[in-house]
């Protein structure tokens, strides 16, 4: 065990470099409440949350995390006020316009999961360009869950399998967990070992509900804009001190 140092010293967080989770998923919660506490508009909370994404992406990359999946916008978030939704749809472009050169320099690959075709054209354009420009990178894969819902993902997978079964392309005997995984957005990714949710809420909110069957959950009270490198180190330390049994002893 030895300390992992960030650019600004991390206090008393020893994490084992040999046991860094390959895939960390984060429900970035609390932007609006953070802003309300500070008597600021909700969109200011989302802006500050974007700065946190940059910090955490840098640190996860430095630690050697292979996949970092961030719940950016759910299929349920369309019900929020129109001006807030419009701002959230603008954020991916703002983020990538300012951060993409650094992502390329750090060998980070950008990916998305979710029903991307239903996003506004300018949002799709920004993320598709980032994916194209980073597709050959081999470091951290930064995955944005955009217009993502776990139940809708599962239903979509079932529909695709049913169509293939109906057409005679597959038999019932071929349908297994492994086969089912191939129809999910995350088909080419390992399941998350660690799921983190900020803001004190303790639920999945329809995020990676199939993939997180055996993930370790860490719920912390900090709002997402306050989450930093030390916070992530603490979450990883908690994960490393748990025993993952996968239903065994």
Curated annotation (Swiss-Prot):
Q: Which domain of life is it from?
A: Bacteria
Q: Which CDD domains match?
A: Cis_IPPS (cd00475)
What results from changing residue 76 to Q?
Slight decrease in activity
Q: EC number(s) per UniProt? A: 2.5.1.31
Question: What cofactor does its activity depend on?
Answer: Mg(2+)
> What outcome is documented for mutating residue 78 to I/R/D in this protein?
Decrease in activity
Q: Which residues does the Swiss-Prot or TrEMBL record annotate as the active site?
A: 29, 77
The record's section on InterPro entries has: UPP_synth-like (IPR001441), UPP_synth-like_CS (IPR018520), UPP_synth-like_sf (IPR036424)
- Residues recorded as binding Mg(2+), renumbered to this chain, are 29, 216
Q: Which is a GO BP term held by this UniProt record?
A: polyprenol biosynthetic process
**UniProt keyword terms in alphabetical order:** Magnesium, Metal-binding, Transferase
Q: What positions does the entry give for substrate binding?
A: 30-34, 42, 46, 74-76, 78, 80, 197, 203-205
Q: What is the effect of changing residue 84 to Q?
A: Slight decrease in activity
Q: Paste the cofactor note.
A: Binds 2 magnesium ions per subunit.
PANTHER family from the UniProt entry? DEHYDRODOLICHYL DIPHOSPHATE SYNTHASE 2, DEHYDRODOLICHYL DIPHOSPHATE SYNTHASE FAMILY MEMBER
The record's function comment reads:
Generates ditrans,octacis-undecaprenyl pyrophosphate (UPP) from isopentenyl pyrophosphate (IPP) and farnesyl diphosphate. UPP is the precursor of glycosyl carrier lipid in the biosynthesis of bacterial cell wall polysaccharide components such as peptidoglycan and lipopolysaccharide.
Q: Which comment does the entry carry about domains?
A: This enzyme shows a novel protein fold completely different from the 'isoprenoid synthase fold' that is thought to be a common structure for the enzymes relating to isoprenoid biosynthesis.
The record ties this protein, via NCBIfam families, to:
PRK14830.1 (NF011405), uppS (TIGR00055)
Q: What is this protein called?
A: Ditrans,polycis-undecaprenyl-diphosphate synthase ((2E,6E)-farnesyl-diphosphate specific)
Q: Which organism is it from?
A: Micrococcus luteus
Q: Which gene encodes it?
A: uppS
């Amino acid at each position: 065990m030895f300390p992992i140092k960030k650019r600004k010293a991390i206090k008393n967080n020893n994490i084992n470099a040999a046991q860094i989770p390959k895939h960390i998923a984060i429900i970035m919660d609390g932007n609006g409440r953070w802003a309300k506490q500070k008597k600021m508009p909700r969109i200011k909370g989302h802006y500050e949350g974007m700065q946190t994404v940059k910090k955490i992406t840098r640190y996860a990359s430095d630690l050697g995390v292979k996949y970092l999946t961030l719940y950016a916008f759910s299929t349920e978030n369309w019900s929020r006020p129109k001006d807030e939704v419009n701002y959230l749809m603008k954020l991916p472009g703002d983020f990538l316009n300012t951060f993409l050169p650094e992502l390329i320099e750090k060998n980070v690959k950008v990916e998305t999961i979710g029903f991307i075709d239903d996003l506004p054209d300018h949002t799709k354009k920004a993320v598709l360009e980032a994916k194209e420009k980073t597709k050959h990178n081999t470091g951290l894969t930064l995955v944005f869950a955009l217009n993502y819902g776990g139940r809708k993902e599962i239903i979509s997978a079932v529909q695709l399998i049913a169509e293939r079964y109906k057409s005679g392309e597959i038999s019932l005997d071929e349908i297994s967990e492994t086969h089912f995984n191939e129809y999910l957005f995350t088909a080419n990714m390992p399941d998350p070992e660690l799921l983190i949710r900020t803001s004190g809420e303790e639920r999945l909110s329809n995020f990676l509900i199939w993939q997180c069957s055996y993930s370790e959950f860490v719920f912390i009270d900090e709002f997402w804009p306050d989450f930093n490198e030390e916070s992530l180190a603490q979450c990883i330390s908690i994960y490393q001190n748990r025993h993952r049994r996968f239903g065994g002893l």
